[in-house]
Amino acid sequence: MTLIPASTCRLSGEPLVGADTLFEIADCPLPGIYPAAVEESLLLRTPLRVVQARESGFVQLAHVFDSNLYQQYSFAGGNSRAYRGHLESFAADIERTFLKSTSILEVGCGDGWLVRRLRETGFTDLLGIDPSRAAREQAENQLVSGYFPDDLPASHRHRKFDLVISRHVLEHIENPRPFMAALAAALAPGGQLWLEVPDLNSTLDRNLWSNFYQLHCNYFSALTLDQMAATAGLRCVAGSVVDVFGGSLLRKYVSGAAPALPVPPRLHEVGGRIKAFSAQLSRLARQVPAGTAGYGAAERTAVTLGFAPELAGALAGLYDGNALLAGRYLAGTRLPILGKEALFGRTPPCLLIFAISNAAEILDEWHVRLPGDMLVGVVGGNFPLQPLKAFR
């Protein structure tokens, strides 16, 4: 796959001159695509290089990707109890804040869960748009298959909404400034924009290095997300960090001038910390017995194996709770994906949890259904391989 170097800072729009490389993986699995054939899987590898712009301090991917990849992209991380609980909480927040007559646009609606949930609770003026296959299959549920704003139906192209929602989309956008401007332009007078993105500071504080991957072009802190919103004439009126994907920002914006904001600090120590993480994974690969399997096949599993390719070679396969992934391969590897129930029929000698943000939920089920003497490790965790019963 041919990559084009990014030429501008995605926050300031200025030329990306003299950016500092935070880290680089020369050959990394490409997350979020699940091929049916191993030959196709092995082609899905690209470089991964993350830089920090010197003038603005913004952290971003150093390359440009073809947006057509998103037609193949499958978000695989939404099956946990914690994530579903967060979606319910998000919907409840909307119900508390807005009247049922509120006009709502969700940009990046995925399979339309939130649109359907809000309709079930009495909201009637709803529209979702997403380029994924899931949106195409749900067209009858007020979902549009395509890219915002160009693929909105003519009847909605210049429409204004009381609430615009975009969850875990902005980090994927190659040119976020015009995208943010389009979100702001879709707001009715007095309307609100609710944004949710992975939180860079949570990633750094918790050493969640697999939050960096090729289809995340942009890495926002609360500061830089507010700066991006300010380029579109928006100011933040409320914000929090929510406990999904290791910590995500949920911030709410209205039209208005934002206060002056400082330049983010330099992140000089990241490269050394990532080298230590890679060394930890390499040691783990040498420790696991033959027949070891992994649990969790979402995007972060693929990039974790990019940090330590020998760990991929030490695994016999992966299990995942998303039944739609069964029978496919983790991109960039030879690792087949099996459904969760298959795990309980032929228990491997050792299991490594890659879905670390859901580790507690996974372990709760394993305590009931798997032998207590089976070896378990949490990839990137702070404890070594140990029997399952030791995790109580």
Locations of regions flagged by a protein language model:
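A conserved beta-strand element that flanks and buttresses the S-adenosyl-L-methionine
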Residues: 165
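Hydrophobic, well-ordered beta-alpha structural blocks that scaffold small-molecule cofactor pockets
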Residues: 93-94, 250-392
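A short glycine-rich, Lys/Arg-flanked "PGG" loop and its adjoining helix->strand segment in the class I
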Residues: 177-192
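Conserved SAM-binding strand-loop segment of SAM-dependent methyltransferases
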Residues: 140-153
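Short, glycine-/aromatic-enriched active-site segment of Class I SAM-dependent methyltransferases
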Residues: 27, 195-218, 222-224, 228
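Extended interfacial segments that mediate partner engagement and assembly in macromolecular machines
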Residues: 43-134, 208, 213, 218, ...
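N-terminal juxtadomain amphipathic helix
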Residues: 2-82, 240, 252
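Conserved beta-strand signature within the Rossmann-like core of class I S-adenosyl-L-methionine
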Residues: 190-198, 375-378
